[in-house]
């Protein structure tokens, strides 16, 4: 198998993982905003997410002089470590599934900020102690502090932007009570031209609500925040579980049995994530949640609208997780949690693709820039804390 042995190689893995893991949520959000049911999107996503793990295992897990290889470990008595890997896959799958609904309620940027902050506070601390403190604490924990400051800015951005949107929509009493003639008149005065609303206007927000799969107007953001915090707790546990699977800090393996390599662990990790996602999403097809329309497995198979984007999201997430674990195995999983600065990438895509924060107030822009700058500092500091596993 191929092993990352240099600090530079580990950091390169983390940076690439950061790009991939910050991009796939934007793609999933794009399909939902275009009206595709999240159950359909997630079923497609989970197929290629598993395929990415298989590709990594059959290539990087088999090449190179390091032993044992992927196929060798499949027959070894290492079920204890396999259970840790599969537990990590289960909580990650639950977290990813939850965030798919949270994005609609509280937005892509804020969802990623909150879940990332919980992951850093809980997950990075657990990984630091599990890794026998190979990361430099005097650098690592100031990085965590920078992350928390960025989270505070992120919360302020959400509050300020929500106030901006409320101001934009103040001429609209409700979608249900506004006549079609009034809607056309008001929309025209708020940026709707030739059937296409300008990003950041009240007309744009209304047009988006009509088109998207998950309807959010008139619903409390508390629902979204609860889902988001649940996802954050799940995300904070999957990396420590994977850490235990590959390094056996609790000495659960029998004497002489090799520890799981990162590729074998990632394979089992992805298998459990796939099974959980498959079971839950097939259930959600027939018994949907949050007011979504009912679907069926036949309808899913016939729904090709956005399928390519969903497949791409699965590949990006799968390869992103694999790169994160490869970097973590080499430089410490606490340092690899620097990929939780993925809101940097998600916010970029949110602004570029979805017009988030367009036509917002100067206060919102100031807070947004402050959040992004603090995230940049946080990811740099966490990567600087990288150690080297002996």
From Swiss-Prot:
Pfam family, one: Ureide_permease
InterPro entries with a match to the protein in the record: UPS_plant, Ureide_permease
Tissue occurrence: Expressed in leaves, flowers, roots and stems.
Domain of life: Eukaryota
Extracellular side, ranges: 1-9, 66-78, 123-136, 243-261, 329-333, 385-390
Expression induction: By nitrogen deficiency.
Compartments where located: Membrane
Cytoplasmic topological segments: 31-44, 100-101, 158-221, 283-307, 355-363
GO-annotated molecular function: allantoin:proton symporter activity; ATP binding; uracil transmembrane transporter activity
Cellular component GO terms held in the UniProt record: membrane
TM regions (residue ranges): 10-30, 45-65, 79-99, 102-122, 137-157, 222-242, 262-282, 308-328, 334-354, 364-384
The entry's keywords: ATP-binding, Membrane, Nucleotide-binding, Transmembrane, Transmembrane helix, Transport
The protein's role, per its UniProt record: Proton-coupled transporter that transports a wide spectrum of oxo derivatives of heterocyclic nitrogen compounds, including allantoin, uric acid and xanthine, but not adenine. Mediates high affinity transport of uracil and 5-fluorouracil (a toxic uracil analog). Mediates transport of free pyrimidines and may function during early seedling development in salvage pathways, by the utilization of pyrimidines from seed storage tissue.
Name recorded for this polypeptide: Ureide permease 1
